[in-house]
């Protein structure tokens, strides 16, 4: 549901056996793994949508993505009724959207953001990294390099969001294989663009 017509649903990396072993090693008792037809009947026509938070960043180029994310996550919460749910900070916009959804709809669950986990060379871990060949994998390191540059500029006292994001873009653009969708400084809660690097702020890029 959160995948668009030309996106990678069919080829998205899945390894249930590996996931199950990791869960078992972590002490998990039960894995919830429904079939698509169990979650979405032929008559399914109800969706969760949101204004504002889903129109910036990834929402501009993937207009139905967050509607799908919110719908499937809310269904999961209703079925499983968890006390806590964990979402990676790597997708900061998704985390903000889910937090807003559970607040607005009075869902009794605590949303916890999990820090980004990186490979030894700095690349953020992601199931989609398997799509990269050796050359692309090496080129992708420019992303973590841009993050470090932004952090250094902010630590050195640069307060202008435009100055920091411009410097990050210029670094990424030096990598021939890189294609920038956006590099933006936004409020971490509202996902609205900001002009100053003042908390709560994050720089999102794709």
Predicted regions and their residues:
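Long, charged alpha-helical interface segments
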Residues: 145, 205-206
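Nucleotidyltransferase catalytic core that binds NTPs
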Residues: 1-179, 185-198
């Amino acid at each position: 549901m959160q995948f668009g017509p030309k996106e990678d649903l069919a080829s998205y990396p899945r390894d249930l056996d590996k996931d199950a072993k990791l869960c078992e090693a972590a002490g998990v008792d039960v894995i919830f793994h429904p079939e698509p037809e169990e979650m979405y009947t032929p008559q399914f026509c109800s969706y969760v949508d949101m204004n504002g938070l889903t129109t910036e960043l990834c929402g501009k180029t993937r207009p139905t993505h967050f509607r799908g994310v919110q719908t499937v996550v809310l269904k999961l919460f209703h079925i499983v009724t968890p006390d806590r749910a964990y979402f990676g900070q790597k997708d900061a916009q998704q985390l903000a959207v889910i937090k807003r959804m559970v607040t607005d709809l009075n869902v009794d669950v605590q949303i916890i953001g999990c820090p980004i986990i990186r490979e030894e060379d700095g690349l953020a871990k992601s199931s989609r990294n398997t799509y990269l060949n050796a050359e692309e994998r090496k080129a992708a390191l420019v992303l973590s390099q841009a993050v470090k540059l932004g952090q250094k500029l902010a630590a050195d006292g640069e307060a202008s969001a435009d100055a920091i994001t411009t410097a990050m873009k210029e670094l990424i653009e030096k990598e021939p294989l890189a294609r920038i969708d956006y590099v933006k400084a936004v409020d971490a809660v509202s996902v609205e663009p900001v002009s100053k690097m003042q908390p709560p702020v994050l720089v999102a890029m794709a």
